[in-house]
Amino acid sequence: MYDEALKIQSKPRSFEAFVALLTLERYVNGAIIQWDRIQADKEALPGPGVDRTLMLKLFLDIHFYFICCDKAQNLLGYLSKTDSSQKLVRLWQTLKPNFKPFNDARNHLEHIETRIKKEYLFDLGNLENDTFTFGGERFDISASSLKILTDAYEQVVNILRSRP
C-alpha cells in the first residue's frame, strides 16, 4: 500500500494535479487490495466443482480490480495534463498502451448488458489460473499485471519527488 501523495503534496504544479495524484494513489491502493482479495478467493476455492458464492465473490473482486486499474490509468493521464510536466506527459504516452487490457476488460464488465449476445454467451467471464477471459479475449490478472500499475505509480512519484 502506498502513502506517498501527502508526503509530496508541494510537488505537483496545480491543485488539480495534486488531487489527481491523491486520487490516483487511492485507486492504485484499491487495485492492490483487490488483487490480494483475488488471490485469497482463488485459494479458498475447494477445487473441482463450483462453490457459487465463492465464484461470485471472485468474479466481483476481479471486476473491481479492473475498475481500479482503469480509473488509475485515467487519473495518470489527467495528472500528466494538469501538471504540465513533459516528463509526466512522456511517461503517460509510453505507458498508455500497457493499460489498454484493463480498459477493455472493464468495458466488457461495465457494459455487460450489451454483451448478452450469442457471440459472448459461451464466455461472460471465466478464470484460467491467472487469466480472466471474456468473449474469447484473455486478460492477465497475475502479479505482473498489478506490477504494471504499481511501477507506473512509482515512476510518477519519482518524477514528482525529484523536483526542487
Language-model segments: which ranges?
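Histidine-centered, metal-coordinating catalytic motifs and their short helical/loop contexts
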Residues: K96-E119
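Amphipathic alpha-helical interface segments
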Residues: M1-N98, E128-P164
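Surface-exposed beta-strand edges and their flanking turn/coil or helix-capping segments
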Residues: R106, L124, E154-V156
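Interfacial non-cytosolic loop connecting adjacent transmembrane helices
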Residues: K118-L124, N129-T131
